[in-house]
């Protein structure tokens, strides 16, 4: 954590966890020590100007952010849920490379009065779930909650990280699970639901770490996580690889719609291309995982992007331009 920053405006009546940043950092330090234990000899975690960690080569490095009003609504998610999501979506990028996370730092920008310990508890809970140690971060003021997480990871074995650019014509396409659950969960929350599997999928996404490592062991040619909707992320993989794609179906989560599966986003299932489907299935079985779901194939026609022989709708979310992909100007 970096040094204290002035808190704008009067602090009378502000929750102590924000009015006194040093005290907040001290409580977060105790929280991380309770969950992760003391750092190994030679490492420094939360509390200094920078963390000191042992790294392996090659090092995986990814960052992601969640923003109030874009990625979550506090009417539907607790602060702990927000912290969980912030770390998990960054860890998902490590999973998409076939790696496993090691350490994370988290910046929390929050309005006055925000219970930052609850946010930190959610981050730490996810860190414990994904074996990712929280080793530092920053705390500052903002008009809305923004959490930015940077995660490091490593690769087991000698195989290289899996990129999204390695697919070739003839490769078969798979996903690790049904899609659309998060979007359906948000829809249910807006309609008054407060619990259920779909709501859980929206509030507490899962990173497919075991699946990503199994896919890498199976020699998949390309892989990425489905964060912005299958229709959009599939186009990204196809563009990076210089291939077309032809889907024969979309696995829709129970209670979700096909539109939510194609464009809802925040599923964090893994999209994989492989030249050896049997090897992929065997790797998943050996790891005790549910079988990957076959959805289509890569083609030589780079302009092809079809679903059941028809042009696939351009659904998904473009965060940089702040509107659904279907509303992009051509």
Report each predicted region and the residues it spans:
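Active-site-proximal betaalpha loop/short-helix elements
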Residues: 113, 200-267, 299
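Short, compositionally biased
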Residues: 183-201
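Short, conserved charged micro-motifs
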Residues: 114-117, 276-283
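Acidic, Ser/Thr/Pro-rich beta/coil linker or hinge segments at domain junctions
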Residues: 3, 7-9, 203-206, 282-330
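Short hydrophobic/aromatic beta-strand micro-patches
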Residues: 152, 271-275
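Glycine-rich anion-binding loops of enzyme active sites
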Residues: 56, 66, 100-187, 297
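Small-aliphatic-rich amphipathic alpha-helix that forms the alpha element of a beta-alpha
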Residues: 79-103, 118-129, 210-214, 232-237
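Extreme N-terminal cap/leader segments of soluble proteins
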Residues: 1-78, 97, 102, 106, ...
């Amino acid at each position: 954590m970096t040094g204290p920053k002035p808190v704008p405006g009067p602090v009378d009546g502000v929750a102590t966890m924000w009015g006194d940043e040093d005290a907040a950092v001290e409580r977060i330090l105790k929280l991380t020590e309770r969950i992760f234990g003391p750092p190994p000899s030679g490492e420094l975690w939360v509390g200094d100007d920078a963390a000191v960690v042992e790294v392996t080569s090659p090092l995986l490095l990814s960052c992601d952010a969640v923003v109030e009003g874009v990625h979550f609504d506090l009417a539907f998610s607790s602060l702990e849920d927000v912290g969980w999501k912030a770390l998990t979506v960054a860890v998902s990028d490590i999973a998409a490379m076939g790696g496993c996370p090691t350490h994370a730092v988290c910046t929390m920008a929050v309005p006055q009065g925000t219970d930052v310990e609850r946010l930190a508890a959610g981050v730490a809970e996810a860190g414990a779930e994904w074996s990712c140690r929280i080793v530092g971060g920053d705390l500052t003021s903002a008009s809305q909650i923004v959490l930015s997480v940077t995660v490091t990871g490593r690769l087991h074995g000698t195989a290289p990280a899996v990129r999204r650019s390695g697919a070739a014509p003839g490769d078969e396409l798979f996903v690790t699970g049904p899609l659309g659950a998060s979007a359906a969960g948000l829809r249910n929350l807006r309609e008054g639901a407060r619990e259920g599997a779909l709501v859980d999928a929206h509030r507490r996404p899962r990173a497919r770490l075991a699946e990503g490592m199994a896919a890498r062991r199976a020699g998949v040619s390309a892989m990425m996580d489905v964060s912005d909707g299958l229709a959009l992320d599939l186009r990204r993989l196809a563009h990076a690889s210089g291939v077309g794609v032809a889907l024969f179906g979309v696995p829709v989560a129970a209670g979700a719609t096909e539109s939510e599966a194609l464009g809802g986003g925040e599923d964090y299932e893994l999209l994989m291309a492989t030249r050896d489907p049997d090897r992929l299935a065997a790797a998943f079985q050996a790891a005790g995982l549910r079988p990957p779901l076959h959805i289509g194939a890569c083609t030589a026609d780079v302009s092809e992007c079809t679903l059941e022989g028809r042009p696939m709708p351009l659904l998904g979310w473009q965060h940089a331009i702040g509107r659904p992909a279907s509303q992009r100007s051509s």
